[in-house]
Swiss-Prot record:
Recorded superkingdom: Bacteria
PANTHER family the UniProt entry points to: BLL0828 PROTEIN (PTHR38590:SF1)
Protein name as annotated: Uncharacterized protein HI_0925
Native source species: Haemophilus influenzae (strain ATCC 51907 / DSM 11121 / KW20 / Rd)
Family label: To E.coli YcjD and H.influenzae HI_1162.
Length: 121
């Protein structure tokens, strides 16, 4: 189990209860071990963050980015966060909300290919 800041637990529970349409759409495709038997958690506290989706077995983090993530200050924060997580052995995959809503098959395919590669290593 990965460590996390305890104060994040309540926030993550609220986020799970109020998931966005985009999060719901992807969750329907990756929950219940649907992708090669890998289990995902949603709105998972991890270190000092809450990540959208997390697969502990592969240390894969999936983030869904709304329009606010394309503003310079958010891009900088996301880059620092991703760099910290990558330095600790996590892989971060980012998809825009538009990608998930319009091209869900392509998004799931990218996740599947990553998991397949990890599984064969």
């Amino acid at each position: 189990m990965q460590p996390y800041e305890k104060y994040l637990k309540l926030n993550s529970q609220k986020l799970r209860a109020d998931q966005t349409d985009t999060e719901r759409k992807l969750w329907q495709r990756i929950n219940r071990d649907q992708l090669l038997g890998f289990r995902f958690n949603r709105q998972k506290p991890l270190l000092s963050y809450i990540v959208d989706f997390y697969c502990a077995k592969t240390k894969l983090i999936i983030e869904l980015d709304g329009s606010q993530h394309y503003k310079p200050d958010y891009q900088e924060k996301d880059a620092l966060r991703d760099a910290e997580l990558n330095s600790l052995g996590f892989t971060v995959m980012r998809f825009s909300n538009d990608e998930v809503m319009r091209e869900i098959e392509a998004v799931v395919e990218q996740i599947y290919l990553f998991l397949e590669n990890v599984r064969t290593d």
